Amino acid sequence: MRSFQLLQLTYVVYLIIFYLVFTCRYSQLELHRFMRLSFNNTETAFAYKTNKELQAGRFLFGTMNYAWFAAIGVRLTPFLMKTGLPVHGMIRQTIFKQFVGGETLEQTAKVAKKLGDYNVQVILDYGVEAKEGEENFDKARDQFIRVIEYAATQPNIPYISVKITGIARFGLLKTLNSAPRLRSGVHDHEEEDAEWERVRERMYDICEVAAEKNIGVLIDAEESWIQDPIDRLSIEMMTIFNKEKCIVYNTIQLYRHDRMNFLRMYHSIARQRGFILGVKIVRGAYMEKERTRAEQKGYPSPIQQDKSFTDGDFNSGVEYCINNIDEIATVIASHNEYSNLRAAELLDAKGISHDHPHIHFSQLYGMSDNITFNLAKAGYSVSKYLPFGPIRDVIPYLMRRAQENSSINGQTSRELLLIKSELKRRIKVAKAAKSKNVSLSSS
C-alpha cells in the first residue's frame, strides 16, 4: 500500500516537472497548436457585446431572416432618406450600429479600441460611395491619406481599404479594360491616357504615405468589366512599394473561374520583378450582376458553375498562398467557418506562427463574431473590416449588407442562432449566480 502511494506521488511529481518544462519551452501562442480551434464558443464571440446590444442584434437578424422584408427595406430606405423623413435615428440604432463603426473617425475610434481590447485588429474603410469628377477624385485621395495617417496613430489598425472607383472614372476603367493595347500599358486616346496618368498619380500618393506610415493598402475588387486596369495598377504599385515588406494588396475574387490561374500568374510576375505579392482572398461580391450582364451581352459568364467550385478554388487559393508564405502575404477574408478552420489547420500543420506577418484573417464588422474573436483568442492575426461615414453616404454599403444577409444561404440564421445561444447562456449564468447568492445568504 505504501509503495503504491509512493508510486502515485512520483507520478504527480513527473507531471509537474513535465508541465513546467513544457510551459517554459512553449509560449502561450504555441500552446494553442495543441488545442482544437472551435467557432462555437459564444462567450468568447460576444464578450465585447452587452445584453442590450445582443438583443438589438437578435431583432435585426430576425428581421433580415425574412427575405421579403429585407427586399422591401432595401428598396424603401434610400427613398425615405431622400424624402427628408426622420428615419436617421432608426437607421442609426439598427443596421448602421450593427455594421458601421461611426459617422466620423472619432466615433469609429471607440469601436476600434473596443475591438483592440480583445486582440482584434481593424481594416479601416471610408465607406462613402465614389462621386465622379476630377475634383471629387482628388478629395477621395486626400481622404484616404487622412485615414492612413490616423491608422498610423493607432495600435490595432494595420490596414485601410481603397476602392479604385473612388479615384478613377468608371467609364475610363471600362474603356481601358477592353483596350486592345492594355497589356503593353499603352492606350490610343491621348485624353484618356492623361486621365489614367492622374489615376496612377493618386494611387502612388496613397501608397507612398502608406509605406512611410507602415500601413497596408487593400485594393478592393470590382466588376470583371473594369477589373483588368485595377489589376495592372496594383501590380505597378506592388513593384514599387512591396520590395522589402508588403504594403499593397490586390483582391482576388475566387467566384471567377479564371482567378486561380490569375493568382499563379500574379505570383510568377512577383518572382520575376522581385516583390512580395499581396493578396486579399475573397469569394466575391457581384455574382448576380456578373451573370446578368454576361447573359444580356451574350458572352460566357466569368462566374463559377456553382458554389462548390467557388469553395474549391477559394480553399485552393488559400493553400497556394500558405505554401508560398515567404513570397505571398495573404488576407483571408471569409465568413465560411470551414475555410477559416482549414486555413488555421494548414498553418499548424506547417508549423507557421499564428501571428506570421504574411497571414491575416478578416471578417466584416457586425458579422461572424464567432470566427473573429475565437481566432483572436487562439492567437491568430485577425481583423474586422470596419467602415465609417455619414449615414446618408453609407446607405449603399448598408443595403448590400442587408441583401447579402438575406441571400447568403444560412448566414442570417447562423448569426441569429449564435446570438440566441449566447443570450440563453448569460441568463443561465445569471440564474446560477443568483441561486448561489440566495443559498449563501440563507446559510
Task: Please provide the spans of the model-predicted regions.
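Cationic, low-complexity basic patches in intrinsically disordered or flexible, solvent-exposed regions
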Residues: L6-L9, L29
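Short, aromatic- and cysteine-enriched interfacial helices/patches
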Residues: F4-L7, F22
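Positively charged, amphipathic and often flexible ligand-engagement surfaces
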Residues: V13-C24, E30-S443
